[in-house]
A protein has these predicted regions:
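Substrate-binding clefts and catalytic carboxylate motifs of secreted carbohydrate-active enzymes
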Residues: 2-165
Length: 165
């Protein structure tokens, strides 16, 4: 509360926000909701996507979704971007180019890690790491090629009305 009060006293030129997701405890979430100039949130599950947005729109402040795209949970660009556009919600996704952080791999990749290690299901240093069939995050490979040309064409189309025809 003191930090919010100080921040509002300073009155920076940019809006203040603290993401509702990742905040611990109902009182902190409520404080962040009440004090933020812009409501920032993230949601990865398709079934919770629209209800979450409908609830947050009731607050009456601009919304920015700071994390949303997880293909295996149904929150694809094709699913999310039309909703953001229709509701005038800002967004950015986690991951652009598959790289060091390996966010093209699912959270499930590390499940049962010890059992997989015991079975020898790990690559050795110098072995080529094969990409997952369905990427979790990220859009491009290191060489600049798309994970999915259809997906990148959709993004271009919804943002600019452009296509690669």
């Amino acid at each position: 509360s003191n930090i919010w009060n100080w921040a509002h006293e300073v009155r920076p030129t940019q809006p203040l926000t603290s993401c509702l997701d990742g905040s611990i405890g109902d009182s902190i979430i409520e404080l962040n909701k009440n004090k933020s100039d812009i409501i920032t949130f993230h949601t990865y599950e398709a079934k919770k996507f629209k209800p979450t947005i409908q609830e947050l729109l009731k607050i009456g402040r601009p919304l920015i979704c700071t994390e949303y795209m997880a293909r295996e949970y149904g929150t694809t660009f094709e699913f999310c971007l039309p909703i953001f556009k229709e509701q005038n919600i800002g967004c950015y996704n986690w991951g652009l180019v598959a790289g060091k952080s390996q966010t093209n791999f699912s959270w499930k990749t590390i499940l049962h890690l010890n059992e997989r290690r015991d079975k020898g299901e790990f690559i050795e240093e110098g072995d080529k790491l094969t990409e997952p069939e369905v990427w979790f995050h990220d859009i491009f490979r290191k060489d600049g090629s798309s994970f999915s040309d259809a997906e990148t064409n959709f993004i271009k189309q919804i943002l600019h009305g452009a296509t690669n025809e």
